[in-house]
Swiss-Prot record:
Name of protein: Probable potassium transport system protein Kup
Origin species: Burkholderia cenocepacia (strain HI2424)
Source lineage: Bacteria, Pseudomonadati, Pseudomonadota, Betaproteobacteria, Burkholderiales
MF terms in GO: potassium ion transmembrane transporter activity; symporter activity
HAMAP family: Kup
Subcellular location: Cell inner membrane
Length: 638
């Protein structure tokens, strides 16, 4: 009997383990991926019926708006992102930069099309930051505003409580969130169950709201109200904030667990809650004051405020972590100057902290909270960054479908036409809100786009100038060995950006010190257009003879170069040992000098020179002991 039982368990264990793993990943994804979109019910419907839109609270208009919300979630989240966009993974990784890298792969990088796609991808990434400063502000503020419903005499504390929560959230970032992160999934599962239950309670009382599933009501609403209805689309898109996160976080959890969570819990819960809010408004139009919190019975208001606040903090955490990850990717791809990136967990590779980004985000978010004062005012600023990124994602996905997957062009045209019609409709509606607050994310995105493009162009010019004046490395080394300078004991590592050219730091060392170490390694780091590089493909080394080695280490854009790991691997394959504290690292400290040479306008060159000067030192970025570094200065005119 026991043998049979064990045999049966063994036979079923792979499947049960796989199911358990899927559920565990889905729950983890719910805690990270769906925080933003999951907290949208706090403000979306309320904003759609803003008095500024002039839409009467009749049963017909309520059914029309709920129908628009339903079909927006179904088509954009359920079809576009979950079924189509998430197929376009870059070796398992998602997000606008990963999609951009994938779309550029089959193209000649020097063509105008490639340049336009690169600019689109970078602009999409910049708009993410425009979104990242609004999400924590509007999410936390809208949750704390529940106090105005639960205990009106505490309404004056909404702003101070919001500020305290946000400061605390950003302060804990440097300590890592791995421990509390384990609770995010279960808490967000509870959140979705609660908002679904609240919705069902009111749907049962007004079952007629289910008719909003019929797209006729959405079309009728648009036809009856025309321009007003188009303005309302700018608020309807608030239900989609966070949809891009489904794709961006795909590398952390995988497409299947995200789809599993979305179709199994998240989308049904959101739809039920929105329909419940619609039912409440049909029954009591005065509930438009705050339809989300008024779903709850009086005894449940304070617990719901607490749960909402925790859920919005989790949603904000996901956006903050996303900003760190995107910054790290952009650094590796060469679009952003080097910044100090700290790993906050020894177990989770993706747990990073970027101090500069953290404190800049907090400063801007606090200014936004104090300046806009309420989630109603801030809602006008929300949406334009989201819709701009949605349009860019659709365009890049189109290129991937045609150039990478070789899909039929007519089929791709039909699919993209539908998605672009929806995306551009939402984007156009949000452009109408530029004066009311939409200028904020657009301004942030435009400023960052200018800085990133200036940095990318400047680095390209520096590389061209360096290559034009450079000396081929291997012939130089052969000549050096034929007429060797004085050799000194020890190991020297020359970090260089081009493994084909002689490092400027070597030339200066030979010129001033006239010595060469017995063991000399020329180390170059290269970032590939894939998220991760396999360990067995990471490193290549050439023995130039006489104790001279040329080593190239390749990393994906989701990885951080590790000097120590590279030297350990090189030592294993070449039967050597390295002690960082006994090794000298030679670096060229470049000083960029703006000139009137062809390249960029002089004022942009000055901006680039300032960025170059303030980039993180290589010792910080590569985690090299500062007392083992020899920096030799060089000037580069651009």
């Amino acid at each position: 009997m026991n043998d049979t039982t064990h045999a049966t368990d063994a036979a079923h264990s792979p499947h049960s383990t796989q199911q358990h793993s899927m559920r565990a990943l889905a729950i983890a994804a719910i805690g990270v991926v769906f925080g933003d979109i999951g907290t949208s019910p706090l403000y979306s419907l309320k904003e759609a019926f803003s008095p500024a839109h002039g839409i009467p609270l009749t049963e017909g208009s309520i059914l029309g708006v709920i129908s628009l919300l339903f079909w927006a979630i179904l088509l954009v989240v359920g079809v576009k992102y979950l079924l189509f966009v998430m197929r376009a993974d870059n070796n398992g990784e998602g997000g606008v930069l990963a999609l951009m890298a994938l779309s550029l792969r089959p193209l000649d990088s020097k063509t105008r099309v490639a340049g336009a796609l690169m600019a689109l991808g970078i602009f999409g990434a910049c708009m993410f930051y425009g979104d990242a400063v609004i999400t924590p502000a509007i999410s936390v503020m809208s949750a704390v505003e529940g106090l105005e419903i639960a205990t009106p005499h505490l309404s004056h504390l909404v702003l101070p409580i919001t500020i305290v929560i946000l400061i605390a959230l950003f302060w804990i970032q440097r300590h890592g969130t791995a421990l509390v992160g384990k609770l995010f999934g279960p808490i967000m599962v509870l959140w979705f169950v609660v908002i679904a239950a609240l919705g069902v309670y009111h749907i049962v009382r007004v079952p007629g709201i289910i008719a909003a599933i019929n797209p006729y009501y959405a079309a009728s609403f648009m036809a009856d109200h025309l321009l007003q209805a188009y303005v309302v689309l700018g608020s309807v898109v608030l239900v989609l904030t966070g949809a891009e996160a489904l794709y961006a976080d795909m590398g952390h959890f995988g497409a299947k667990p995200i789809r599993y969570a979305a179709y199994g819990l998240v989308m049904p819960s959101l739809v039920l809650n929105y329909f419940g809010q619609g039912a409440l408004l049909i029954q009591n139009p005065k509930a438009i004051e705050n339809p989300f919190f008024l779903l709850a019975p009086e005894w449940g208001l304070l617990p719901l405020v607490v749960l909402s606040t925790v859920a919005t903090v989790i949603a904000s955490q996901a956006v903050i972590s996303g900003a760190y990850s995107l910054t790290s990717q952009a650094i590796q791809l060469g679009y952003v100057p080097r910044m100090k990136v700290l790993h906050t967990s020894e177990l989770a590779i993706g747990q990073i902290y970027v101090p500069v980004v953290n404190w800049l985000l907090l400063a801007v978010i606090l200014c936004i909270v104090v300046g806009f004062k309420s989630s109603d005012n801030l809602a006008a600023a929300y949406g334009i960054a989201v819709t701009a990124t949605m349009v860019i994602t659709t365009v890049l996905a189109c290129v991937v479908m045609v150039k990478v997957w070789n899909w039929n062009r007519l089929l791709v045209g039909a699919i993209i036409a539908v998605f672009l019609a929806i995306d551009l409709g939402f984007f156009g509606a949000n452009l109408l809100k530029v004066a009311q607050g939409g200028w904020l994310p657009l301004g942030i995105g435009a400023l960052l786009f200018f800085l990133l493009m200036t940095w990318y162009k400047g680095r390209h010019i520096v590389k061209e100038r360096t290559a034009a004046d450079g000396i081929p490395l291997e012939p130089f080394l052969q000549g050096l060995l034929a007429h060797p300078p004085h050799r000194v004991s020890g190991t020297a590592i020359y970090l260089t950006g081009n493994d084909k050219l002689v490092p400027v730091s070597l030339l200066h060392n030979l010129k001033h010190n006239k010595v060469l170490h017995e063991r000399t390694i020329f180390l170059t780091f290269v970032t590939r257009d894939i998220p991760y590089v396999r360990d067995d493909k990471r490193q290549s080394a050439r023995d130039a003879g006489g104790g001279l080695y040329i080593v190239k280490a390749e990393y994906g854009f989701n990885e951080t170069p590790d000097v120590k790991a590279v030297l350990e691997e090189f030592g294993r394959t070449h039967d050597m040992t390295f002690e960082l504290m006994d090794t000298s690292f030679f670096l060229a400290r470049e000083t960029v000098v703006p000139t009137h040479l062809p390249g960029m306008s002089i004022w942009r060159e000055r901006v680039f020179a300032w960025m170059h000067q303030n980039a993180a030192k290589p010792t910080d970025f590569f985690a090299i002991p500062a007392n083992r570094v020899v920096e030799l200065g060089t000037k580069i005119e651009i």
